UniProtKB/Swiss-Prot annotation:
This enzyme's EC code(s): 5.6.1.7
Family statement: Belongs to the chaperonin (HSP60) family.
Organism per entry: Pluralibacter gergoviae (Enterobacter gergoviae)
Keyword Manganese in record: no
Annotated TM spans: none
Chain residues that bind ATP: 30-33, 51, 87-91, 415, 479-481, 495
Record-given protein name: Chaperonin GroEL
Catalytic EC class: isomerase
GO molecular function, one term: ATP-dependent protein folding chaperone
Catalytic activity: ATP + H2O + a folded polypeptide = ADP + phosphate + an unfolded polypeptide
Quaternary data: Forms a cylinder of 14 subunits composed of two heptameric rings stacked back-to-back. Interacts with the co-chaperonin GroES.
Length: 540
């Protein structure tokens, strides 16, 4: 086992604080509407330019191992805030730096670290309750656009696009961010349920100009099996032909004789048919077939429940207003399923999301909810160069996370004002002893740090602005973009409650651990092995 380097007490804390400051100082220059960019070198390709706190934090590794431990612990704050709310990473870092700096000063002055931590935790718990009380629900499109705009660093077009996407696919809908092809940002919305399976034969195409199959008011046959024998399909085909409507077959697979017969029928115009494979694999395929059945008021023909394809009737078939199939995707628009049944199915899937243990499962279940509840929107980010594209895409993703958080837990006044109001409401809070009271004061002072940093990044005097904001009440604050005072909510400067809450909780959690650190252990650097000496008589 390698020998260790051990540092105690003040020696350890000073080193740790130095690492915290290096990382936090690099991250906090990005805070606020007038925050600056940070350029990150890459081992290959062009450097990345970003204003995203967590991206900056992830890049920082320090040479001194003790300093690096301090930096890595603050990096954890940014990562946790990012995972929980998708935004607020810079705010969390600024809060953590302030709590650690003030807390370590108090420890150096002889306070008990454990009592300090208890005081900080008490203040943060009270602050979180006050934040919830200040929170206003965020439901209308205008508020969503404002949250998106603030989170995308005052880029109004991004805020509007996100609000429009949420309008179209609902709060539950899936919104994804992709690279665009032009200079402008675009929004593509797929209404209805879309899954990534295309037609099984190009002979089904009835719209050659678009290379797609379009079926109006079709019957939809859902089968959880491979279909290779046409005899199984004949009764359904005859019934559908009599009804004079097209038919879409969604099955595990349609092959051989069955597929050939369907193609011949379509080409001769006897009955309009198209066949696609069911989406997903294994149990997920069964679940998705059931989703489609709920959406179209059909029944999945499955041998597991004793149903045979030959005995299927028109009552077992689902229906939709329209189906569009191309090479890679199938979209079912306006299924005739009952709203109550669809909501029931959505509730059932939500329950599974609660119980899901892996992120992958959770994501797939969320997609299924979206497909049942609304649709899918794709924001295509436009930019002139690849470097700008990466930077902008990161901002749009941040803004999207922020708006989701706002819809979930509501919004509070932005620009660091909410934390100042919360701090003013809990100034009377008392701990069990004097050291805990100092811990409470440390947390209250930290709650001013985000506002001070936003003002500092504008080139103004933080103390003057902080005192002016403190002298007001409610949503009165400082608009750093226009350098005016006023009602933050009226000016459209909103922060999602979840983002502010997560930033405060994670910052206090990690800062509390660092304040109570008394010893740090790391590997001693290995001495380089001496070079092999030249062999005798071989000198130059």
């Amino acid at each position: 086992m390698a020998a260790k380097d051990v540092k105690f007490g003040n020696d350890a804390r000073v080193k740790m604080l130095r690492g915290v400051n290096v990382l936090a100082d690099a991250v906090k220059v990005t805070l606020g509407p007038k925050g600056r960019n940070v350029v990150l070198d890459k081992s290959f390709g062009a450097p990345t330019i970003t204003k995203d706190g967590v991206s900056v934090a992830r890049e920082i590794e320090l040479e001194d191992k003790f300093e690096n431990m301090g930096a890595q612990m603050v990096k954890e704050v940014a990562s946790k805030a990012n995972d929980a709310a998708g935004d607020g990473t810079t705010t969390a870092t600024v809060l953590a730096q302030s709590i650690i700096t003030e807390g370590l000063k108090a420890v150096a002055a002889g306070m008990n670290p454990m009592d300090l931590k208890r005081g900080i935790d008490k203040a943060v718990a009270a602050a979180v309750e006050e934040l919830k009380a200040l929170s206003v629900p965020c439901s209308d499109s205008k508020a969503i656009a404002q949250v998106g705009t603030i989170s995308a660093n005052s880029d109004e077009t991004v805020g509007k696009l996100i609000a429009e996407a949420m309008d179209k696919v609902g709060k539950e809908g899936v919104i994804t961010v992709e690279d665009g092809t032009g200079l402008q940002d675009e929004l593509d919305v797929v209404e209805g349920m879309q899954f990534d399976r295309g037609y099984l034969s190009p002979y089904f195409i009835n719209k050659p100009e678009t290379g797609a199959v379009e079926l109006d008011s079709p019957f939809i046959l859902l089968a959880d099996k491979k279909i290779s024998n046409i005899r199984e399909l004949l009764p359904v085909l005859e019934a559908v032909a009599k009804a004079g409507k097209p038919l879409l077959i969604i099955a595990e697979d349609v092959e051989g004789e069955a597929l050939a017969t369907l193609v011949v029928n379509t080409m001769r115009g006897i009955v309009k048919v198209a066949a696609v494979k069911a989406p997903g694999f294994g149990d997920r395929r069964k679940a998705m077939l059931q989703d489609i059945a709920t959406l179209t008021a059909g029944t999945v023909i499955s041998e597991e429940i004793g149903m045979e394809l030959e005995k299927a009737t028109l009552e077992d078939l689902g229906q939709a207003k329209r189906v569009v199939i191309n090479k890679d995707t199938t979209t079912i628009i306006d299924g005739v399923g009952e709203e109550v049944a669809i909501q029931g199915r959505v509730t059932q899937i939500r329950q599974q999301i609660e119980e899901a243990t892996s992120d992958y499962d959770r994501e797939k279940l969320q997609e299924r909810v979206a497909k049942l509840a609304g649709g899918v929107a794709v924001i295509k980010v436009g930019a002139a160069t690849e470097v700008e594209m990466k930077e902008k895409k990161a901002r749009v993703e941040d803004a999207l996370h922020a708006t989701r958080a706002a819809v979930e837990e509501g919004v509070v006044a932005g620009g660091g004002v909410a934390l100042i109001r919360v701090a003013s409401k809990i100034t009377e809070l008392k701990g069990q002893n004097e050291d805990q009271n100092v811990g409470i004061k440390v947390a209250l002072r930290a709650m001013e740090a985000p506002l001070r940093q936003i003002v500092l990044n504008c080139g103004e005097e933080p103390s003057v602005v902080a005192n002016t904001v403190k002298s007001g009440d409610g949503n009165y604050g400082y608009n750093a973009a226009t350098e005016e005072y006023g009602n933050m909510i009226d000016m459209g400067i909103l922060d999602p409650t979840k983002v502010t809450r997560s930033a405060l909780q994670y910052a206090a959690s990690v800062a509390g651990l660092m304040i109570t650190t008394e010893c740090m252990v790391t590997d001693l650097p290995k001495a380089d092995a001496p070079d092999l000496g030249g062999a005798g008589g071989m000198g130059g």
